Amino acid sequence: MLVWLAEYLVKFYSGFNVFSYLTFRAIVSLLTALFISLWMGPHLIAWLQKLQIGQVVRNDGPESHFSKRGTPTMGGLMILFSITISVLMWAYPSNPYVWCVLFILIGYGIVGFIDDYRKVVRKNTKGLIARWKYFWQSIIALAAAFTMYSIGKDTSATELVVPFFKDIMPQLGLLYVLLAYFVIVGTSNAVNLTDGLDGLAIMPTVFVAAGFALVAWATGNVNFAAYLHIPYLRHAGELVIVCTAIVGAGLGFLWFNTYPAQVFMGDVGSLALGGALGTIAVLLRQEFLLVIMGGVFVVETLSVILQVGSFKLRGQRIFRMAPIHHHYELKGWPEPRVIVRFWIISLMLVLIGLATLKVR
């Protein structure tokens, strides 16, 4: 909203014109979200401790996790607040893509908050019943998917971008809604599954968001979009502001979530961040790129699916424990080693994903 104010003030002082530059707004969006997180963190942690809102730890998990019992959770509130304020300050409020992401971010944040509340306040270890969680995730995702389809149904915004093939961009039509639904819900739950160690989920989220910031900038630039053979989408540029806000809020949260964590994000953070990343990927027409850049989330999810499937079909487990990060813990890897190695893999996958944009 400050952009509109700056457009008015530029009549009195030309220096306010700097607010019209996307790169400037992207930087201040990141810094705004970062500083809000850093400021809010100690206050939120103290408040959560006062209310005794602490993490519930599984009895069948690694023994090293027992010391985490009681650590404040629902820290994702600071992430959501930081992102929302930063985006509202620095993005153009008239941009429909921005509102689609905020709708998912806040909607999934509410679902996650209810789940966390039932777990840590009501002492219900199951939290929100799975079918109700999935129901509300589905309703919110479908509402966003139909909205996004109505915005771009007559443009290249509903084409499917296939990696490595510059001339293959099939028009999805209404299948766009179905794809958007699965990507948003799937990514939300994938990030949620990954959030099992201190800082494990937030840093890959930051890497992927940073990667999508570059993609959004290119997609919203007619010349770079043509150069990379990706669809030019005139609303996409403002998603840079959203992505950099996620990066800033994520780094601010990591300040308190790094090993040993002072606070956990909880479902209020992981479901919302995953949903936001999925929505950004759909809006940019880069669902396949999300699979590559978010490979850590994909592998974590597949490990759970394979573990459950193998146990039901063969009565045997593939991993010592799923998601797969617990498998490595039980093999004797110290928690920081698991975390940092997953970070390195995530960074490599983001770079590989960005490289595929040119390898066509």
From Swiss-Prot:
One Pfam family named in its UniProt record: MraY_sig1
Top-level EC class: transferase
GO cellular component, one term: plasma membrane
UniProt-annotated location(s): Cell inner membrane
Domain of life from the UniProt record: Bacteria
Record-listed E.C. numbers: 2.7.8.13
BP term (GO), one: cell wall organization
Signal peptide annotation: none
Membrane topology: Multi-pass membrane protein
InterPro entries linked: Glycosyl_transferase_4, PNAcMuramoyl-5peptid_Trfase, PNAcMuramoyl-5peptid_Trfase_CS
KW Cell division (keyword) present: yes
Name assigned to this protein: Phospho-N-acetylmuramoyl-pentapeptide-transferase
Native source organism of the sequence: Yersinia pestis
